[in-house]
Swiss-Prot record:
Annotated protein name in UniProt: Histone-lysine N-methyltransferase E(z)
Lineage: Eukaryota, Metazoa, Ecdysozoa, Arthropoda, Hexapoda
Biased composition, class Acidic residues, residue ranges: 203-213
Chain positions of motif Nuclear localization signal: 505-510
Enzyme Commission no: 2.1.1.356
CDD domains: SANT, SET_EZH2
Cellular localisation: Nucleus; Chromosome
Length: 760
């Protein structure tokens, strides 16, 4: 789209419309300020008059202490040079109070937060007149670090979201008027064709190939309606005004009145404002700001499946938001730690534990198994080999949590044929619900869009287990589900569903030389001690992890979040320790990692109750920190003290804060150095933890060249985290120190007092 040359006429048109919009904004803003000033002045005068009318005189009634006769008094004999009667008052002595150390506002948090880079300087920090006198160029250098971008400075090419939308609409009106003058009725025909194309794409489920060359996606029918004649009549010359730059334009007005802008409009804006992005990026931004439907853009998100506008869509569209926003590393939606592009996709590999097999007996009187000829069909299907045989997979070389399910205390009373456990009370309740639906015949059954979408989601999980699908839906009997499935199977091939799963692995024995593996871990740790990169799950299904794998390129182990095979040679296997995992005999401890509860089960890291955990290498992920007390320090400012004692190498606390990039840390660090107070802590080669704005109490631990604590960056379930540990035995009430790793110059500049060593 950007390769097309923009005519000079369009560039002049964009510049002219932009100047008009800026002038209108300026005049409107001036009128708003004037009106606001008048309103505030009237309200102020009204409040002042009320105070004058209801003013009260305060009468001082001093309290005289019992020893008032012995207190020294102050005497006044004249006022402004005019003699007056003597006035005496006792002198009250206010003793000096030691002020508490200065503290800047910060938000307490017990976890790290990933934040975006600040490319615009929001405010110019005040350093005091002394700093500006000594280094007058500091502010200039600071602004240069942000490429001269300061919040509030509106350069000639300034354009916020509201101006951008108004500029697009103004160009659309001028473009439409130009077509009207060239050929009467052309603009109306183009507008009608565009809107009709959009409606047809929604009604017929057909969408053209988009601008990026993506394959077309079939869209389902929608209930959207529109009258093209009324749209043509409502065309106006008035610009769309918004009251605030942060407020989006009227979405419904944009949808109903205006067609989608022509590509030349975004190309012309991009040519005049290249710093705002390419034409395609501006197009995406316009869609986001106005929620305008691009007729050439396939739909991604659908209405809520529980809402009244639920549509009958494919499984991919139904699960789009879940797959996009759900973080499989935090098990949260829209987590604060991992960015969307870093979210691992769903792992489509076959599970190793048993699947829920179809029921052998009918689940109710309305079960699909009671259909004539169904038992013979099911018997024939049972002779076909299953998709996956769970018993064929070797578990000796597996470190997944599922490989040791046999050691758990499961209830096997209701399980049959290695199936999953089914609670009898739950089955009875479900059967009662299904029995109440027996009177609903298949002819009376209505499959809403929500029912159809939910079936497509469950069908990929339970396959042909229609009883299980019906038990989950609770609105249809399994016979109704079976009949609907036959219609769906005509359009959806079951073989395509089988291909989504990993084929079964053949039974094989694989002897792991544990000592060689531990030696490999140590070599990898030693070679990459100075090059620690952030972990991002690799995603190359069907291909082994080689030099093209992102994990191998960054010298990281493949984790359980990677979409590579579970037999990957680069995947960390966990440990098999029977002890506390606090020595180098443990592979996890040796690799500076915490034990993973999904991988390390022999050491007790997978136990939910803390009383059953024998592993000492899970403190960071479980939050087993010490009780810390904050108080003024004898060294500098505030300090942090330990309420209870700690043994050597015992976990104290995690250093939490904002996770920022190295570039952002350089920009912030220049300001912190001037304040002579920094909370930056290197996490890896990509990110830094900054506890200035957000953090926990360990941020107040002071520096010492002879500390009683040490910091260690550990890999905790795929994330680098900073743990503070006791370097020696620490007594209760002792202040905590760790080495900031200052250079000789910074040591003398920032740390003027060194605590005295106490011999215990």
């Amino acid at each position: 789209m950007n390769s097309t040359k923009v005519p000079p006429e369009w560039k002049r048109r964009v510049k002219s419309e932009y100047i008009k919009i800026r002038q209108q904004k300026r005049y409107k803003r001036a009128d708003e300020i004037k009106e606001a000033w008048i309103r505030n002045w009237d309200e102020h005068n009204h409040n002042v008059q009320d105070l004058y009318c209801e003013s009260k005189v305060w009468q001082a009634k001093p309290y005289d202490p019992p020893h008032v006769d012995c207190v020294k008094r102050a005497e006044v004999t004249s006022y402004n040079g005019i003699p007056s009667g003597p006035q005496k008052v006792p002198i009250c002595v206010i003793n000096a109070v030691t002020p508490i150390p200065t503290m800047y506002t910060w938000a307490p948090t017990q976890q790290n937060f990933m934040v975006e880079d600040e490319t615009v300087l929001h405010n110019i920090p005040y350093m005091g007149d002394e700093v500006l006198d000594k280094d007058g160029k500091f502010i200039e250098e600071l602004i240069k670090n942000y490429d001269g971008k300061v919040h509030g400075d509106k350069d000639p090419s300034f354009m916020d979201d509201a101006i951008f939308v108004e500029l697009v609409h103004a160009l659309m009106r001028s473009y439409s008027k130009e077509l009207e003058e060239a050929a009467p009725g052309t603009a109306t025909a183009i507008k009608t064709e565009t809107l009709a194309k959009s409606k047809q794409g929604e009604d017929d489920g057909v969408v053209d190939v988009d601008a990026d060359g993506e394959s077309p996606m079939k869209l389902e029918k929608t209930d959207s309606k529109g009258d093209l004649t009324e749209v043509e009549k409502k065309e106006t010359e008035e610009p769309l005004e918004t009251e605030d730059a942060d407020v989006k334009p009227d979405v419904e007005e944009v949808k109903d009145k205006l067609p989608f802008p022509a590509p030349i409009i975004f190309q012309a804006i991009s040519a005049n404002f290249p710093d705002k992005g390419t034409a395609q990026e501006l197009k995406e931004k316009y869609i986001e700001l106005t929620e305008h439907q691009d007729p050439e853009r396939p739909q991604e998100c659908t209405p809520n499946i529980d809402g009244i506008k639920a549509e009958s869509v494919s499984r991919e569209r139904t699960m789009h938001s879940f797959h996009t926003l759900f973080c499989r590393r935090c098990f949260k939606y829209d987590c604060f730690l991992h960015r969307l592009q870093g979210h691992a996709g769903p792992n489509l590999q076959k599970r190793r534990y048993p699947e829920l097999k179809p029921f052998a007996e009918p689940c109710s009187n309305s079960c699909y198994m009671l259909i004539d000829g169904m038992k013979e069909k099911l018997a024939a299907d049972s002779k076909t080999p299953p998709i996956d045989s769970c018993n064929e997979a070797s578990s000796e070389d597996s470190n997944d949590s599922n490989s040791q399910f046999s050691n758990k205390d499961f209830n096997h009373e209701n399980s049959k044929d290695n199936g999953l456990t089914v609670n009898s009370a739950a089955v009875a309740e479900i059967n009662s619900i299904m029995a109440g639906m027996m009177n609903i015949t298949s002819t009376q059954c209505v499959w809403t869009g929500a029912d159809q979408a939910l079936y497509r989601v469950l069908h990929k999980v339970y396959l042909k287990n229609y009883c299980a699908i019906a038990h989950n839906m609770l609105t249809k009997t399994c016979r109704q589900v079976y009949e609907f499935a036959q219609k769906e199977d005509a359009e959806f091939s079951f073989e395509d569903l089988r291909q989504d799963f990993t084929p079964p692995r053949k039974k094989k024995k694989k002897q792991r030389l544990w000592s060689l593996h531990c030696r490999k871990i140590q070599l990898k740790k030693d070679s990459s001690s100075n090059h620690v990169y952030n972990y991002t799950p690799c995603d190359h299904p069907g291909h082994p992890c080689d030099m093209n794998c992102s994990c191998i390129q960054t010298q990281n182990f493949c984790e359980k979040f990677c979409n590579c095979s579970s037999d990957c040679q680069n995947r960390f296997p966990g440990c098999r320790c029977k002890a506390q995992c606090n020595t180098k005999q443990c592979p996890c401890y040796l690799a500076v990692r915490e034990c993973d509860p999904d991988l390390c089960q022999a050491c007790g890291a997978d136990q939910f109750k803390l009383t059953k955990i024998t592993c000492k290498n899970v403190c960071v992920q479980r939050g087993l920190h010490k009780h810390l007390l904050m108080a003024p320090s004898d060294i500098a400012g505030w300090g942090i003290f330990l309420k209870e004692g700690a043994q050597k190498n015992e976990f104290i606390s995690e250093y939490c804060g904002e996770i920022i990039s190295q570039d952002e840390a350089d920009r912030r660090g220049k300001v912190y150095d001037k304040y002579m107070c920094s909370f930056l802590f290197n996490l890896n080669n990509d990110f830094v933890v900054d506890a200035t704005r957000k953090g926990n109490k360990i941020r107040f631990a002071n520096h010492s060249i002879n500390p009683n604590c040490y910091a260690k960056v550990m890999m905790v379930t795929g994330d680098h985290r900073i743990g503070i540990f006791a370097k020696r035995a620490i007594q209760p009430g002792e202040e905590l120190f760790f080495d900031y790793r200052y250079g000789p110059t910074e040591q003398l500049k920032f740390v003027g007092i060194e605590r005295e060593m106490e011999i215990v």
